[in-house]
Amino acid sequence: MGVNIHELEDYIHNIEPVTFPHQIPSFPVSKNNALQFPPPGSKDAEDRKEYIPDYLPLIISSQEEEEEEQVPTDGGTSAEAMQVPLEEEEEEGEMEDDETVNDENYLSKRPLDSPETMEMPFAKRIRLMNNKGDILDGSLEPREPLSSINSQKVPSVLSPAHKIDSQDLDVSYSDQIMLSPVSKSQAPPPSESKSLIPKTKSKGGSPGQKIKSPKATPISTVIGSPIRSPKSGPKERKSPGCAKSPKSPKSPKVPLAAPPPAIKTETPNRTPLATLSEKIGRENIQIKQNQTPLDSDQLNVEIPSKKPSIADNTIEDSIDAVIARACAEQEPDPFEFSSGSESEGEVFTSPKRLNISELTTPKVSASGINPGKTSSTSVPASGGTSSSDISWTMDDSINEVIRKVSQETPTNTPANNPPCFSSPSASPPTPEPLLKVFEDKAKLPPPVELKKKTKKEQRAKKKKDKDKLKDKERSKDKNKDRSKDKEKDKEKDGTKDGKVLWKDSNKDEDSELHRFKLKDFNEIDSKSKQKENCGKKDKEKHKDKKKDKEKGKKDKDKKGKDKTKEEKMKSPSTPIMLSSKDIALPMISTPNTVRLPSLLSSMSPLLPEKLFEEKEKSKEKDKKKDKKEKKKKKDKEKVKEKEKEKKEKEKEKEKEKKEKEKVKAELSIPAPSPVIPRLTLRVGAGQDTIVISKVVSAPESKAVPPPSLPKSPPPTPSPAPAPVLVVPPQAPPAPAAASPAPTPAPSALTSNAGSSKTPVRSVVTETVSTYVIRDEWGNQIWICPGCNKPDDGSPMIGCDQCDDWYHWPCVGINAAPPEDEQWFCTKCESKKKDKKQKKRKHKAH
């Protein structure tokens, strides 16, 4: 072989040692891990809620995974995106069932393959979430800006557009205005949004999304002032992700309307564009409304002024057609829109709602354009808000929601109005955009957090939305009767206007216009709280739902009161309501639109500054104060009630005493029977009249006086201070002095029926012994110590010393003793004997 043994040994020892023939077990022995702990950097670990232990797998339904995979493709087409929300509504029922099983209740182990599949959908979800969040950020932000559209900045850019196309341009113009303010609001945070956006793009940004974003950006640029457009551009880049959401489908259409000339072209083509935009926009709107019917309801409340204009249009016809279309197109992924937009929409349900109502309110072309633009821009805003919900405090999110709602309500009406030929100036609530800009800045950092949101949260939000919808539907049914008359009037005016109005929006608008005028801020607060709590435990969610229901009930009860108060507070908003009605007509006539700018201009400063600040701050404080005050009031009321009860009892006692005294006086007057003579003793100042009645047989009447007199003296001393009667043993002197008629007194010794009636015998004694009981009327009842039975009316004899009264049979007396003799009971006699004996002993000594 030519191999050197030493070299071979050296080789084996130093270079390639021979493996030991037996396997050496390495401890601890590794086991297959079926617990699927999320890797430290995975989204699962970030999204996992605190109350879910690490060893439990994240539960995601297979439907969600499939839907998420489909989402990127569906997001590209507007029709599919439109369909997605409708499917979401249909599938929400199924999803809820699946969710209950998969998300929370499904504890069985998953196959080892599931983690990988889980991770892929998660990445997609993150992208979708981010994209949707971005889209929501863009769309919601624009929606906020839409409401806060600065009339000053927008009119310059938009005014030409209005001139170009009176109606179509107005619609598109309003859309542009809506978008431009959004872009402005977004513009301050664009750098932040950009930093967040790249993450979203890197994670899930698909080329389609990027393409969509440019579309959204041109629209925003065209719509907004050139300064706004660049800012809106980056946010809309976020929106590209948003483009996937049903809102994004609108965005492609938006590009058509984006350039003012394009808008002009739309005006001639308005009918086809309107039809397409109506179909898509309506479907999207319906889907959005269905997905976030609560949001739409809130929007209706928030945008009551917009809704009236929408209601003016022939809503029912268009709604029926749209519903049919939406039902046909419901197949697209429900999660595509719902996962991103709904969750975010819930965070800022008011902005989405506003966008939906706005999209629907503008004419068909506007609906097509606005949905795209607003959706692209506004969606990022919602996304930002949703992420901000996680990062922000409850108060911040509530304030933002309130601001957005308040801003959107006035601004949305203007936005709708400009399409109605209102001059571009009509659209500008300038103060709102500033507020939104700050809110957007605050919100931009949170978009990254949107990634953290899991589909569980989205599902929970969907469930909440459904619950809210149910509650609202109930309240709507009640309010329908009231709103029917108004709806009829509005529909008459609205028939002249666009067909884009939806039944859902109309019904919700009319019924909710009433509700939400009262509930705008209350519900916004409660809903914003719910949105913020979405990231919290499901238990808290259920509690929030219950609270919302209770609040809704309370709000209904308080509608009458709240209407008067809010009408005073919202005097500017009421003009908007009128303007919206006028606006429906102005779609044809410009003069009404002229009214709008003035109303809007007045509205914008009043609502955002006063209503929002005062209501936001005052409501939170008022709630806390109210709770404390209620507790204090309850405690005070309890104390007062107790005091009142005590006083009442005392008064009643005093009354009873007075009545008793009166009854006694009255009873003392009539003689119970001729056989029972009465001895009336007036004690002291004659306040109490003591009647001592004894039933005596005629022959005994002569001998009766001595025992009867002892009976009278003991009662007299206690009630009155009369000193004359104080000496009980001396019976004869007392009656002689106190009673003018001593002759009847002897016969009064034996109390028969009269004595049995306690009210007749009001005998009071100082020597209260165990044998004297007071009845409920304060009268004394004598008990015979011999037989322990109360005075039953049979003749009794009283001891002149201890004032105990005995039945004659108990003492062995058959006939009344002589009047002059004193009678002592056995106890007193024994005591006297003892005393006499002691005296004798002392004398003897």
Swiss-Prot record:
The record's subcellular location field reads: Nucleus
Q: Where is the composition biased (Acidic residues)?
A: 86-102
Q: How does it assemble?
A: Component of the TFIID basal transcription factor complex, composed of TATA-box-binding protein tbp, and a number of TBP-associated factors (TAFs).
- Per its UniProt record, what Pfam families does this chain match? PHD
Low complexity compositional bias: what residue ranges?
A: 240-256, 409-425
Origin organism lineage? Eukaryota, Metazoa, Chordata, Craniata, Vertebrata
What cellular-component terms does GO give this entry? Answer: transcription factor TFIID complex
Bias type Basic residues, positions: 452-465, 624-635
What role does it play? The TFIID basal transcription factor complex plays a major role in the initiation of RNA polymerase II (Pol II)-dependent transcription. TFIID recognizes and binds promoters with or without a TATA box via its subunit TBP, a TATA-box-binding protein, and promotes assembly of the pre-initiation complex (PIC). The TFIID complex consists of tbp and TBP-associated factors (TAFs).
Give the primary localization class: nucleus
Q: Where is this region: Disordered?
A: 59-120, 134-163, 175-314, 330-582, 607-670, 699-761
Gene (UniProt): taf3
Comp. bias intervals (Pro residues): 704-722, 729-745
State the family it belongs to.
Answer: Belongs to the TAF3 family.
Recorded hits in CDD domains, A to Z, give: PHD_TAF3 (cd15522)
Q: GO terms for molecular function, please?
A: p53 binding; zinc ion binding
Identify the keywords attached in UniProt to this record, alphabetized. Metal-binding, Nucleus, Transcription, Transcription regulation, Zinc, Zinc-finger
The protein's name: Transcription initiation factor TFIID subunit 3
Q: Polar residues bias: where?
A: 175-186, 286-299, 357-396, 752-761
